[in-house]
Amino acid sequence: MSLAEKFAVRYAGLRQAYGTFTANNETREDGKASGKNITISKELSDSDLLKLWEDHLSGHQSVGIVAIDEHNKCVWGAIDVDEYQIDLKDLAVKIAKQELPLVLCRSKSGGAHIYIFLTESVPAAMLQRKLRQIAAAIGYGQVEIFPKQTKLLLDRGDRGSTLNMPYFGGENSTRYAYDKKGAAMTPEEFLNYAKEIELTPNELEKLEASP
């Protein structure tokens, strides 16, 4: 598989919408990158999704994916830490020392998107609950969790919430992942690490996290 195909599989989600982010090269007072987030409702074919990822990895257009799918299930989730003064390397090492099956990626603004990956889909409500427990255990109990929704009312136009994906620009990305020692990973290294730490639904159910 190509790199774009691997990312499309790793971050499988809703096929009825996607997001884009266009930066305006300004920074808000809180440190968050300023720009325009747009959610686009569209039925995505395999080729559509592949093109979105190719454009993302090449640095042409950033893509956002909705974690919760049409069946209200997820194969990945994220803890979104919108704090821009934290030491991401230290946090990545802390997560590793707690032996949590997570990988930390630098967000577009310099915060943290902390991901968990699964071998197969689980109910969004279950994943959200577990991620809230984990977030509290690492000291971020009040942050946003993706999936944000546990059920989508698709017939009413509900399309969930997108999360901007890592590795915009591929090898040259500022949205890279950190390994257990706090070193930056290449896209391929990240995908290999995500495979190493992915959980089965049963392993997720049994996962316990404490400070």
Which residue stretches match the model-derived regions?
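C-terminal polymerase-core module
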Residues: 144-185
